[in-house]
């Protein structure tokens, strides 16, 4: 079905990273007017300028990623912890705080956050990352319920084992060690293509998902199956 987002105004954050490229491309193919922002969402001081060009949007894709930073809990550095939250949690709050009320005033809107399945199970050695992604998921659940009556649907894709340059670059995926890891840990025994995740984002951004609110949808090939 072509043109599922015809003339819909879409903001995709951090579009050069994580799932940004695949989502921006698919949404444009479906007729959306995509504003794909390559930069990381700025801190509070620069946020007003960042959103000033998007007074009205129909769809927000909160695509927020931070470079992997794995360490035992005893070795977590304050700077690494704060970096995770400054890049992924605080921007999500500011984006939804700004755009959800505007959507509510107009009586419609979609917000899709690309988060992670990691906090659904927990990853030893990645406590900081799990904490930040878990905060994102909790925020989506709460705000999704808060804005449901205003016909604004806020949901998240909690993914893992999806091809993307930040967490699963091609050279890692191609290695024998990683392929063996997939077979042991992922029931579907493969990694997802970026376009597969983008298709789920498209569904959540379209009118077909109007009855879904506050959902954190696992997309991990069976590695995580519930929230």
What annotation goes with each model-predicted range?
Residues 3-35:
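Canonical Rossmann dinucleotide-binding motif of NAD(H)/NADP(H)-dependent dehydrogenases/reductases
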Residues 42-45, 52, 65-82, 105, ...:
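Conserved mid-core segment of classical short-chain dehydrogenase/reductases
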Residues 71-73, 77-85, 111, 178, ...:
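Substrate-binding pocket helix/loop in short-chain dehydrogenase/reductase
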Residues 110-135, 140-149, 161-162:
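Catalytic loop of short-chain dehydrogenase/reductase
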Residues 121, 202, 213-227:
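Short C-terminal tail/terminal secondary-structure segment
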Residues 148, 153, 212-214:
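Short, small/polar-rich loop/turn modules that mediate ligand/substrate recognition or access, typified
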Residues 149, 159-185, 226-227:
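A glycine/serine/threonine-rich, flexible loop-to-helix segment
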